[in-house]
């Protein structure tokens, strides 16, 4: 990649170093960076980030790319190395970390860039900082972790694939977005003799159903079954031809949101946020874990056996409580199976207390907060001077909601709890950038 020639700075002001930190998963390096002295320089444009080794076999180093340059982007815009197109963010991820990079070490040198335009750029090398990053393997201390990319609108996806996406590229695009998440199914099924599971939606024909069909052991699945269901029943009918498959329908619940598989012989559990659907594995942000723990596997197996009988909601909630902590690798883990009895809050109040007891920071990622106590605890974290950084699926503007009663002359009603939460979130997102929508 081309490299800008660093100009000799004429400033006599002493420039302090960049502060930078890396956050990793098996397929991601996220860099958080700041240049405190940048506020003293009106011509501070952003950062150049040099990775070593680079992006191609034998490449010594290379700059991370950025599609946002000095000219307005269009559909033909090409990504440029960040020494020529400085990164104007304080968070940036290396989208070129792939599953095979697990266990490798990379150096990231973050350098402030000053100037007035594309032909006037100065890399302030005296202020640069190098971060040494060891990318973890998928399996670590008896816990395996997969995150998908789910970034269809990102610069990285645009670099990899055409728009609109040709049909011939769909499989490759799905694999790129899944980012290795699909490998979790082969990992839990491989070598297993008996699998017990509960599944909310089962529609993925790319990886999940073929893996089930190729499985030679006993397969018992509890699935959501409602009138005219098209999210599970077709798949269950397809699996019904397998000699060792047992399907148990679940109908007496509002949402059977379980998605887990248990290797009962080896004592392993696959679970996480991902539905077993094409969207859940690729375009929706999700994760999967495999816990190597006979103790945890026993609890999940008992849960699956309870659900097999299609119990009512009160019967399912009976006795709901946190398990005793169990040691998995270097971690302490406990589990709570919802729902709880009506008006009980044992599960979520435990989370609220953990937030309140945080000493320095709280980082969270969730679909949508609907509990006011939880939201208040999160807001208080920031108000009390601790670090708060959160990501939500979306943050809507409540003023743009349709069917506002006051518009038709009717007396306004007290807003619902959900509306009050949306108003608070929207106002907070306008006030600061500590809680963001996924599309930010």
Where are these regions (language model features)?
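PLD/PLD-like phosphodiesterase catalytic module centered on the HKD motif
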Residues: 2-178, 182, 186, 190-193, ...
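N-terminal carbohydrate-binding/catalytic regions of secreted carbohydrate-active enzymes
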Residues: 185, 198-202
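Alpha-helical transmembrane segments and their helix-helix packing motifs
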Residues: 321-323
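Alpha-helical scaffold elements lining the catalytic groove of polysaccharide deacetylases
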Residues: 342-345
């Amino acid at each position: 990649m081309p490299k800008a020639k660093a100009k000799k700075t004429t400033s006599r002001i002493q420039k302090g170093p960049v502060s930078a930190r890396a956050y990793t998963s098996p397929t991601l390096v996220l860099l958080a960076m700041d240049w405190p002295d940048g506020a003293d320089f009106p011509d501070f444009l952003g950062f150049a980030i040099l990775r070593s080794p680079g992006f191609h076999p034998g490449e010594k180093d290379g700059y991370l790319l950025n599609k946002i340059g000095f000219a307005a982007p269009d559909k033909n815009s090409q990504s440029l190395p960040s020494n020529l197109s400085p990164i104007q963010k304080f968070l940036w991820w290396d989208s070129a970390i792939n599953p095979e990079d697990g266990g490798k070490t990379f150096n990231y040198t973050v350098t402030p860039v000053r100037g007035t335009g594309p032909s006037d750029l100065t890399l302030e090398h005296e202020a640069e900082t190098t971060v040494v990053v060891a990318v973890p393997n998928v399996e670590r201390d008896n816990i395996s972790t997969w995150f998908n990319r789910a970034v269809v609108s990102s610069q990285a996806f645009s670099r990899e694939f055409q728009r609109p996406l040709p049909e011939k590229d769909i499989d490759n695009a799905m694999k790129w977005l899944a980012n290795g998440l699909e490998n979790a199914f082969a990992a839990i099924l491989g070598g297993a003799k008996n699998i017990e599971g509960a599944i909310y939606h089962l529609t993925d024909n790319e990886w999940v159903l073929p893996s089930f069909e190729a499985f030679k052991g006993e397969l018992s699945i509890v699935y959501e079954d409602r009138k005219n269901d098209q999210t599970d029943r077709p798949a269950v009918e397809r699996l019904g031809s397998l000699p060792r498959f047992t399907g148990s329908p679940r109908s007496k619940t509002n949402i059977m949101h379980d998605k887990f598989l248990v290797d009962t012989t080896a004592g392993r559990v696959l679970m996480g946020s991902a539905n077993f659907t094409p969207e859940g594995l690729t375009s929706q942000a999700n994760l999967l874990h495999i816990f190597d723990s006979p103790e945890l596997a026993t609890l999940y197996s008992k849960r699956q056996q309870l659900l097999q009988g299609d119990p009512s909601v009160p019967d399912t909630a009976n006795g709901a409580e946190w398990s005793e902590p169990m040691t998995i690798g270097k971690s302490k883990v406990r589990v709570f199976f919802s729902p709880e009895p009506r008006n009980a809050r044992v599960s979520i109040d435990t989370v609220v207390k953990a937030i309140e007891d945080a000493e320095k920071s709280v980082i969270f990622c969730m679909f949508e907060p609907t509990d006011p106590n939880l939201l208040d605890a999160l807001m208080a974290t920031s108000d009390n001077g601790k670090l708060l950084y959160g990501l939500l699926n979306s943050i809507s503007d409540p003023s743009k909601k349709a069917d506002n009663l006051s518009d038709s002359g009717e007396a306004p009603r007290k807003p619902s709890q959900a509306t009050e939460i949306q108003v608070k979130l929207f106002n907070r997102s306008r006030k600061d950038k500590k809680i963001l929508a996924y599309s930010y």
